[in-house]
Amino acid sequence: MLIRYMFDNFCSFKEECEFSLEAPGGKVKKRFPDNYTTTETGYDLLKTAVIVGENAGGKSNFINGLKYLKSLFDTNMKVQSVNSYINADTLMECNNPKQKFNVVFLAGNHYIYEYETIVDTKGIYSEKLIRSSQRKSAEHVVFDILRDQEDIYTLRRGTAREVTAALKNSNNSNGLFVVKLALLGNKDASATVEWMLNVLYPGNIPSDNIDSIVRQERDLEIMKDPRYVEIFKMVDYSICGIEVDDEKPYSKTLVIRKNAQGKQFKRELSQDSTGVREFFAWAVQIFRVVYENKVVFADEMDRVLNPILSDRVIAYILSLIHISEPTRRR
């Protein structure tokens, strides 16, 4: 579960920007008890949040910041700032501006982690990982690394045994230190990498142009799950099934409908309406939220979820909560 995300100096954002899913206290919390979930770590977290803003107000750049952070975990390339992602004003004011990304989340091992990295055009300036078991409990620093004036990385704080090995031959900034520690067997680093790669989905609408065979296989597994069809058919209740195309599922899949006389007919997804095609893709992400406890950021979701469809999705989710609340972690 995502708790908080902060960043600065990214695209249109010059100053620090913070996004928090902590539920507010007071009367608002009491009025909407179904809008948040209580965790064993002492956090009350919102289940959903809506980012509202005018056109060109920075909503997409906000999500792109998360995409960029996630991409640093995906590759073993040199980690450094890219001029096209640095705020234009800062780029003119500073010779080597720094960008900070900070994320706090509840991982699958039920620990709270705070991960932060600061990067510039030279590479990683600093990187740290902190673990805690409760919202107000003492923090345990896994590692806190800083690049000094001689471009040498040093450990400021931390108890991870694997840090010494990770620091060797690491002055080229290839790959994040947290990824290196995960490869060396550090459990806290592994939990962080696992969450970033397999739990966080920042606004990527699935498509046939997916760049990972593994991710496409995961999408196919979801589409072939009967529960996925229950979500997808909310866009049109005449839909009664699908025949998934394994090579191009987002365009060549056949949508099966049944008319009032009970007769079935099929249509290729690419020939269907824009609304049906887009909801077919977003239904995969809705499935991940409902059944796999993923954290999904959806950009321009209002293109897909009109008021009627929104009510259907919410009613579907609430029905699952009421049925399985005693046994299911929300």
Positions of predicted regions on the chain:
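Pre-Walker A-like glycine/lysine-rich segment at the N-terminus of P-loop NTPase domains
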Residues: L2-Y68
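Glycine-centered tight beta-turn/hairpin loop motif at sheet-sheet or coil-to-beta transitions
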Residues: S12, G108-I112, A260-G262
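Conserved P-loop NTP-binding catalytic core
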Residues: G42-D44, A49-V50, E54, N64-T121
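Conserved ABC ATPase signature
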Residues: T48-I51, Y250-F287, Y291, V295-I308
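Long, charged, glycine-rich C-terminal linkers/tails
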Residues: S84-I86, C240-S251
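Electropositive, glycine-dotted interaction segments
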Residues: E114-V244
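Single conserved hydrophobic/aromatic residue that forms the stacking wall/gate
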Residues: I321-R330
